Amino acid sequence: MKQPDCRLILVFPKTLEENMVEHVLQHPELAGGFTTVEVEGHGKGAVYHSITEQVRGRVRRVRMEIVMACDDAHTLIDHLKEALPTPEIAYWIAPVLEFGRFA
């Protein structure tokens, strides 16, 4: 396995969670594992799916984080863009200075 040197963060609507998880799991050679958590977001790109979200000014989202090799992150992004082309999926890549396990 390549040395992980970046963190891919994906934020997307809860309705896309199963599709996103399925697509990431189809590429174990790129992403060995990931973490998901429910979050709320707001901003110019937010699409409000309910009256409640419009009133609150926030949208429910899922945040997926994957620590991986940067070249694999770009490959995975390409796969996801092709499989799930929507402006409702945001991503960014951040450097990882060190990654390990306690045992």
Task: Tell where the protein language model's regions lie, with residue ranges.
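Positively charged, small/polar-rich N-terminal and surface patches that mediate targeting and assembly
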Residues: 1-103
